[in-house]
Amino acid sequence: MQGHSFFSNAKGKTPAGWQKAFYYRYWMNNEIYHKTVAHFGIRTKDFKLIFYYGNPLGKTGSSKYATAYTPEWELFDLRKDSLEMKNEYNNPQYAKVIHELKKQLLKLKSRNGDNEDEKMPEMQEIMKKYYW
């Protein structure tokens, strides 16, 4: 995770130049405790976009019994759905938002040094087939 103090924000004072988006990645695919599919995503004030690529990629912590899942996307409009109950990814009204978030997601992914999967043929195939 990117490390910056959140103290000013907690007091209701957002510092100038504060980042507008947060990138995260969950490597472990179907590991024993959480049973969560491997994914990465972006969170802004208004939206959360998640790409469940669902492949263990041989990562430590992934279940040795994990199988690959069909990749899928989720988009939540946090202004209307703070509990993240309605996936808006296939809603055409959000097409432009999705496109912009995907571009921003790749920039943040790279900026944070998360580029290991660029050397993984499996992940390259997933990105080619399911990202855009």
List PLM regions with ranges.
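Short clusters of small/polar residues that mark proteolytic maturation junctions
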Residues: Y53-G54, N87-Y89
